[in-house]
Amino acid sequence: MSIIEDARKALLKYPLCDHCLGRLFASRGLMISNEERGRSIKNVLFMESLNSSTGTYNEDTLVALAKSGHRESLLFLRRMGKVIEQQPCFICGNLFDKININDIVSKVEEEINRQGIEFNSFQVGSTVNKGVIENEVKVSTELGITSSESIKRELNRLIGKVLADKLGKRYSRLNPDVVIKVNTSDGSVSVEVMPIYIEARYRKLIRGIPQVGDSSVASVAREVVSELRPLNVVLHFAGIEGPEVRVLGLGRPMIIEATRPLRRSLPGGIITRHGVQLLNLKAAGKVQVREIKSKAGELRRVFRILVKLHGSVTDEQLRSLEDYFSNRQIRQSMGKGRRVKLIYGLKVVPVHGSILELIVNTQGGFSVRRFITGEGTEPSVSGTLGIKVTPIEIDILNIWH
């Protein structure tokens, strides 16, 4: 069935405003608003209902058009001696005539200025009466029309266009800085500030700095993003290390989540405070939070470990240690389970007497300290050499995919 016949069928059953009629055929023709589409369809139906050569007209269609607010149909029927009262739109109850978009925009501006929010992009979310949604679905379903769009989507688009022009900001469906919520029942508005996700890496230049807690990596990160005036800050790390471990090289990946920030300009450069460096700060998204947690174990790490041997070993044993731990699987007890990780390579560098430096290239997600001592780990450095081996210093030289 054609658009015109579908529209005639709809109007004969329900009075519909231009917006709601046009929205039934939203996917049938681009570059035209729903209101313009609905108005054009009514005009075509009006012209088809009149036969100037015979002087006849289709009264049923004209009455349906008049009830739906078509001005020309109302005037024509009145001239024919038939007074038809316009009826409220069955779907929206003439919501588009009642809503004042300019008033809504003014309220949004006032709310943004009141809160002092800095933003570059926005999204609009509207709420409408439940009955409107039900009537919309009822009409589309009964008539078998599959080309429609929701009234909320049209409202969001109309309000969004005016807001974009008025505020000079960009509309974003995927990653907005703020979400503007409009209640069409009472015209109230609210502004929800979305979190900022900041991808970064951190280095720990000195020992004794924990990842979280007081005087930690987390406290430095919170101090840095306090300039954004957030309500709260949540840190997401790609793995953990103890306070005694330095993190060097490229640093450990992290995501800084600043909730409800009033400022959104990210600090740049390398930031050094209290023995912690934050670097490579850039905007991220929620998907990166999931990735940093799920893929932490896939990150490769290079450790520098200074160890003490509690017993004698030969040069041959040390050389064989390097060969043995080349692409070797390590099994490590973790609570009630066991993890299997890969050691890609191990290099032994004698330092002095019983002190050795080990450079370990490994898959992430296991305890390198226990790999040295042998606690819950098979095979281990201590177990392979057959003597007690204890770590003195641990540095993370690099972390990468």
Curated annotation (Swiss-Prot):
The keyword RNA-binding applies. Responsible for synthesis of pseudouridine from uracil-54 and uracil-55 in the psi GC loop of transfer RNAs. Signal peptide: none annotated. It holds the Pfam family Pus10_THUMP_arc. Keywords: Isomerase, RNA-binding, tRNA processing. Residues 64-195 form the THUMP domain. This is tRNA pseudouridine synthase Pus10. Its EC number is 5.4.99.25. It catalyses: uridine(54) in tRNA = pseudouridine(54) in tRNA; uridine(55) in tRNA = pseudouridine(55) in tRNA. One of its GO terms (biological process) is tRNA pseudouridine synthesis. It comes from Caldivirga maquilingensis (strain ATCC 700844 / DSM 13496 / JCM 10307 / IC-167). Belongs to the pseudouridine synthase Pus10 family.
